[in-house]
Amino acid sequence: MAKKTTEAKKTVTVEQIGSPIRRPAIQRQTLVGLGLNKMHRQRTLEDTPAVRGMIRAVQHLVRVVDEK
């Protein structure tokens, strides 16, 4: 029988602070992948290496608001 884990997953909240206008398509797609598509929208995401890599790729367009 599998054990249930009750550990709380770490999360990171990001906010879009830059416009994707006149940015490469890959950066726009990364923002959409993070769930951001309009200015000042915030999303709480699971803190994984993939999400951290996406944040780093568009670090000039997003801001990390909170880490838990």
Swiss-Prot record:
Gene: rpmD
Quaternary structure and interacting proteins, as annotated: Part of the 50S ribosomal subunit.
Regions that span the bilayer: none
Record-linked Pfam families: Ribosomal_L30
One example of a Gene Ontology biological process annotation: translation
Name of the protein in question: Large ribosomal subunit protein uL30
The species this protein was found in: Agrobacterium fabrum (strain C58 / ATCC 33970)
Family stated for the protein in its record: Belongs to the universal ribosomal protein uL30 family.
InterPro entries (alphabetical): Ribo_uL30_ferredoxin-like_sf, Ribosomal_uL30_bac-type, Ribosomal_uL30_ferredoxin-like
Keyword Ribosomal protein included in the entry's annotation: yes
